[in-house]
Each structure stands twice: as C-alpha cells, then as structure tokens.
Amino acid sequence: EKLISAVASTGKPLVVVYIQGRTMNMNLAAEKAQALLTAWYPGEQGGMGIADILFGDYSPAGRLPVSVPRSEGQLPVFYSQGTQRDYVESKGTPLYAFGYGLSYTRFTYSGLELQKGTEMETLQTVACTVTNTGNRDGEEVVQLYIGDKVASVSQPPLLLKAFQRIFLKKGESRQVIFHLKKDDLAIYDSEMNYVVEPGEFKVMVGAASNDIRLEGEFVL
C-alpha cells in the first residue's frame, strides 16, 4: 500500500496489475490508480498477454468469476443474494461485482425477445441484440440471469444460467440467443424432487450481475 501511495503521489497515470489466486483488498488501489488489471495466475505466456492489454494491442474482455469484497467483515459475498444492507460505515455492495469487467470499447443491449421453446429440450429462448458503439473492435461477455418468482421453496433473486462471449467490430451488431433447458429452470422442491415448477420467471440480461441492461418475464 505504501508503494501504491508513493507512485500515485507522482501524479503519473497508475495501473496496478494483480497476480493472485484469490481476491485481495483492492480498496486503496481502486482509489489511487487509474486502472486495475487482475491477471490471476496467467501462466508462462501471461506476461505477453498483460503487455498486449497495457499497450492497447488487445481490448480486455475478462469477467470476474467472484465478487471482490470491500472488507473481511463483508465475507462471504454471494452475488445471488442480491444487494445487502449497508452496515455502520460499510456499504452492502461489493467493491467489484461478480461478472464485472471493463473493455476499451462500449456495448449497448437492445431488443429483448422471449419465446417458448420449439424443441422438446428447450423450454424457453431468450434473445437480444448487442451493438459495439465504441471506437474499436472488442469482445463482450453477454450474461443471462434468471430469477424464479413463485417457487415452492426459497430461491435466490438471480442466478447466472448462461453466458456468451462474442467478438464485434466497431459499429457491428449481433443477435445473441440463449436456449433454456430443464436443468436451467429446475429446482429441488421440499421433498427433494428435481422438478421444473410452473410459474413466473424473471429474465435479466447484462454485462455483470450488477449491470443488468434488459429485463423481462415469462410463464411456464
């Protein structure tokens, strides 16, 4: 932390690169640095990949597989529990949410379409259009979350059910289609039967668990 503060005090743009196998306290770096790059354990070619991102030769498209907490007292942080209450001086939200990640370009979401499945295994299809509205080519990770609104047993408000990583040239649009099957919508009921219960389901499509761009509902 002393090194981060010292480098930041020079007034030069600062990028902090994390090589780690778990989440770390990133509060000071998030406050002082202009960018954070989490590389995890990138392997023997990791240096080349990190350099490509830092020098702008590649637009990053990684997404967090975990939530990054603000403090130890906030643990455990589960994205599926939704927004937690603030406590004393600590916010209820994580510092960086599950599924979060930045890019050197921007993407917009539009045209959510929900249709009943036409195949025996597909119960519901979810489609939307993603457009690269930035000034350079890049990849986006489109994430589909589902919430069971009327289940017989308590369910999380949102669960990641699918995602697609797509490459779009600047100005390009593409329709992304998800096929929801039994395993995507089934739950264990109070008698431990693995069933798909009829009822209302909430659909959420976005760029992260806390960055939902499109919402809709369907009924089984």
Give the residues covered by each predicted segment.
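A short helix->loop->beta-strand "cap" motif at the edges of active sites that frequently abuts
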Residues: 9-14, 33
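Terminal connector regions
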Residues: 181-220
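Secreted, periplasmic, or luminal enzymes acting at the cell surface/secretory milieu
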Residues: 19-139, 145-147, 198, 202-205
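Extended, hydrophobic alpha-helical segments in both membrane/secreted and soluble proteins
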Residues: 1-4, 14-16, 36, 50
